[in-house]
């Protein structure tokens, strides 16, 4: 069949023209109603319909009868238009935290330039400028996401749960979790540490005579509050800090009797002999971190989102394969000693994939704070989790495919992303 009179192109021609993967084209056909024509086993794309669909923001195309009447026909982008597009520079700001060990993958991505590398591979004709925004806590980055000053952010489980609630209060802010980062099981990764002279071994031994330090509005402060609530320790003085390094300094200098610390400061305190870990059942849940973006931004910058997740997965792979090389990068970026970094890296599960166990952890965390109930049956059940970006990133790296649903049951080590 001659294609030219009908303005048809093959599916592969459309893929080459748009510069996307086959998985993206298939998803657009399914979810965004990309216009196509199936003749026998072959899939064809009408050039005019495709152009109208792209110009319409990837929504429904103009009805076929209007196209046939010639009422709204636009030519495909010319060489001049493509040249103009390369002159437009798109700025992307990534928020990261050097003082949170479970989020150290971002330091590797930044140091190695892997995000920029993946962007060049995905869209060689586009110009991007990547900026990096350092923060001392995840809630700072959530505020930056809401303001539109940060597009991709690495945050802990409390900011993840809090952002879901903020999304309900602020209709224009629809947070999407793109992938997990570091994970720690069963209360590891974040704990209460008391000075040895305090003689405190259990949470119920806390008294009002000594203050406790932690980072305000954080995964650490939420867990500390749970310990205090369980033991009815309303009289205990809590000193809120903006930086976890300040909490460790207060503990070392004797200005507080205890501090709720996350890694690497937990291991650092133990290495320096600053105190003893306090046993507290309230800290027994998993400690999780992840990558977030605004859903509308991610949807309109799909190739950028997938590019970052590819770099993110590569950082995880480097940590697992060559922890010394990863630790050296982190030392240079954070100033934390190598002897602290290495054991911390080994204690963390570096896995971007989503398990039902993880969704249950976040659901419980949200219920504790605000009555938030995250749906855990399907990643596509609500705006909180978007599986397609991580799926495409894994496929591009030739890793085993990820399901649309959360991986059931417990963590396994046979597939790590």
Regions inferred by a protein language model and the residue ranges of each:
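Bilobed "Venus flytrap"/periplasmic-binding protein-like clamshell domains
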Residues: 91-118, 191-258, 263-268, 360-363
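Short helices/loops that flank or line small-molecule/ion binding pockets
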Residues: 136-153, 166, 241-260
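A ligand-binding cleft/hinge motif common to bilobed small-molecule-binding domains
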Residues: 154-170, 255-275, 360-371
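Secondary-structure end/capping motifs
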Residues: 302-381
């Amino acid at each position: 069949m001659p294609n030219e009179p009908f303005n048809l192109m093959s599916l592969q021609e459309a893929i080459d023209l748009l510069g996307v993967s086959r998985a993206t084209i298939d998803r657009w056909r399914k979810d965004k109603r990309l216009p196509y024509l199936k003749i026998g086993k072959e899939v064809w794309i009408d050039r005019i319909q495709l152009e109208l669909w792209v110009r319409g923001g990837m929504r429904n195309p103009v009805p076929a009868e209007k196209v046939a009447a010639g009422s709204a026909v636009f030519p495909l982008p010319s060489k001049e238009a493509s040249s103009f597009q390369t002159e437009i520079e798109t700025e992307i700001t990534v928020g990261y935290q050097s003082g949170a060990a479970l989020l150290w993958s971002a330091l590797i991505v930044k140091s190695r330039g892997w995000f920029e590398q993946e962007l060049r591979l995905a869209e060689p004709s586009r110009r991007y400028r990547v900026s990096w925004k350092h923060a001392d806590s995840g809630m700072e980055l959530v505020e930056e996401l809401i303001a539109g000053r940060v597009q991709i952010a690495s945050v802990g489980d409390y900011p993840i749960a809090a952002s879901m609630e903020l999304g309900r209060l602020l209709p224009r802010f629809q947070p999407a979790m793109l992938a997990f980062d570091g994970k720690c099981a069963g209360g590891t990764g974040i704990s209460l540490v008391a000075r040895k002279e305090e003689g405190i071994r259990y949470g119920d031994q806390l008294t009002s005579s000594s203050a406790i330090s932690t980072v305000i509005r954080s995964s650490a402060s939420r867990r500390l509050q749970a310990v205090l609530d369980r033991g009815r320790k309303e009289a205990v003085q809590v000193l809120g800090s903006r930086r976890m390094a300040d909490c460790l300094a207060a503990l070392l200098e004797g200005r507080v009797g205890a501090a709720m610390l996350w890694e690497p400061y937990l291991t650092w305190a133990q290495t320096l002999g600053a105190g003893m870990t306090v046993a507290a059942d309230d800290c027994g849940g998993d400690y999780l971190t992840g990558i977030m973006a605004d859903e509308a931004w991610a949807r309109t910058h799909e190739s950028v989102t997938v590019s970052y997740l590819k770099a993110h997965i590569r950082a995880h792979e480097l940590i697992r394969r060559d922890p010394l090389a990863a630790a050296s990068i982190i030392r240079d970026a954070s100033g934390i000693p190598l002897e602290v970094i290495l054991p911390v890296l080994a204690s963390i599960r570096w896995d971007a994939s989503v398990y039902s166990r993880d969704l249950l952890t976040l659901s419980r965390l949200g219920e504790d704070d605000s009555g938030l109930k995250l749906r855990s049956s399907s990643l596509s059940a609500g705006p909180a989790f978007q599986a397609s970006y991580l799926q495409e990133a894994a496929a591009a790296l030739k890793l085993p495919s990820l399901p649309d649903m959360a991986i059931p049951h417990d963590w396994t080590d046979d597939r790590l992303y």
